[in-house]
């Protein structure tokens, strides 16, 4: 029996007031281990199967990626070792839906002194929450500096009249989206290079380039004509007794 959206067996994803049952979280978590950055089609399939909106699925994967990035390297190695050597009963225990504390994200994260800001305790902020002027200024800075320091964030907060934690969250989210887009592009590029259409296009391009090189070489027609005259003058005959013509 499915848990109701407001039952105690569901939990909230950050400040978005989105509810997920334990069954939904289990499927999302299992898929995340296989593909942390699903494309739009995969997200729609998951949303249909889990009776969620595609935007909810996308938001969950973004925040789950932030959480995974902030895990210490040692913890990741220990988890990998457990996945490979644990008993079936222990693996089943570890595969239970994650605790609420990993799904709940406070609104006011602590300050960070690192130059490249990576904080899992962040607040999602979308383009719709920014004015056009605010969004354009942030995007322009992101093109040259994707990891602004604290001084830059404070300057943006004063200039744009926004909370610094919101600006920090915007940069973190953009970095994760860029990483996801790069993975999607590389996967598409690999599929394209192994496709029959790519092979046909490459063959056509080689033939076209060869023909253009022949047409663009001013000495080639004269050389062929001279070779023809030389063979005719030397009495070169083809197999049928006629002069070989080019």
UniProtKB/Swiss-Prot annotation:
Gene3D superfamilies xrefs: Homeodomain-like (1.10.10.60)
An example Gene Ontology biological process: regulation of transcription by RNA polymerase II
Location relative to the cell: Nucleus
GO cellular component, one term: nucleus
Motif Nuclear localization signal mapped to chain: 163-177
UniProt keywords, alphabetically: Developmental protein, DNA-binding, Homeobox, Nucleus, Repeat, Transcription, Transcription regulation
Start-end of DNA-binding region: 22-72, 129-182
Record flagged with keyword Nucleus: yes
Expression tissues: Specifically expressed during the preimplantation stages of embryonic development, between the four-cell to eight-cell stage and the morula stage. Expressed in adult testis.
One of the record's GO molecular function terms: DNA-binding transcription factor activity, RNA polymerase II-specific
InterPro entries in the record: Engrailed_Homeobox_TFs (IPR050720), HD (IPR001356), Homeodomain-like_sf (IPR009057)
Its biological purpose: Transcription factor that acts as a regulator of embryonic stem cell differentiation during the preimplantation stages of embryonic development.
PANTHER family with a match to the protein in the record: CYTOPLASMIC POLYADENYLATED HOMEOBOX-LIKE PROTEIN, HOMEOBOX PROTEIN ENGRAILED
Assigned protein family: Belongs to the paired homeobox family.
Protein name: Homeobox protein Crxos
Organism: Mus musculus (Mouse)
Organism lineage string: Eukaryota, Metazoa, Chordata, Craniata, Vertebrata
Primary gene name: Crxos
